[in-house]
Amino acid sequence: AQKPVAILGSSAMRMKDHPLLLKFIEKNQIPFGSSTMAKGMIDENHPLCFGCIERGKRQMQRKFIQSADLVIGLGFDTIEVEYEAWIGNTPLLSIDIETPDIDESVKLVGEVTGDLSNSLSRLLIYPAAENNWTQSELDTHNKNYNEALRPSTEAFTPFKAIDIVRKVLPKDGIITYDVGAHTHQIASQWIAPEPKVCH
């Protein structure tokens, strides 16, 4: 693949050795996003991170993902959101604890099924794969995405409140929120620097 992206999902939260996710991403220099439940499995301040999928400004995230030539699902559990909703025609390589639950519209081109820590440990033995992503492409997407999440206004808005709370909470501060439309803005906008601090 010349332009792969990785999507981290909730099954990754069960990993015995979750730092392997970062090793895999950094070794191969793959841009990554996450589902809501997997936020922070890799620090979302990482320069390769393009944020949360299928929440606020989902169409922007879908367009970015569909510009890739391969999606690598890393522990992506379709209980959160089905691949069919966002993957488009981009081929899928699934690395998960079970076979992906997909219909024939998803182009599954490869599958690694089993313990995620073991699977990634074995994949890390191989030489790094090169790709054609540039940091400026990712930076441009992230800038546009974050600006779209925070439209210009004089009013005190939910996105301003979220930014204030993020600023005053410590790095390991935990935010919890209930179901509802506000989850889309929070999940997209809140930066999780580590696992299990955003739920």
Predicted regions and their residues:
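Glycine-rich phosphate/diphosphate-binding loops that line cofactor/substrate pockets in enzymes
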Residues: 1-4, 24, 65-68, 164-171
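Glycine-rich phosphate/diphosphate-binding loops and the adjacent beta-loop-alpha structural elements
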Residues: 3-15, 25, 176
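Active-site glycine- and acidic-residue-rich loops that bind
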Residues: 10-17, 154-158
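Short glycine-rich anion-binding loops that position phosphate/pyrophosphate groups of nucleotides
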Residues: 10-13, 37-38, 76-79, 180-182
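Redox- and metal-dependent alpha/beta enzyme cores, enriched for Fe-S-associated oxidoreductases
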Residues: 15-37, 173
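Glycine-rich, acidic loop regions that bind phosphate or pyrophosphate groups
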Residues: 38-137
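Active-site diphosphate/adenylate-binding microenvironment
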Residues: 140-199
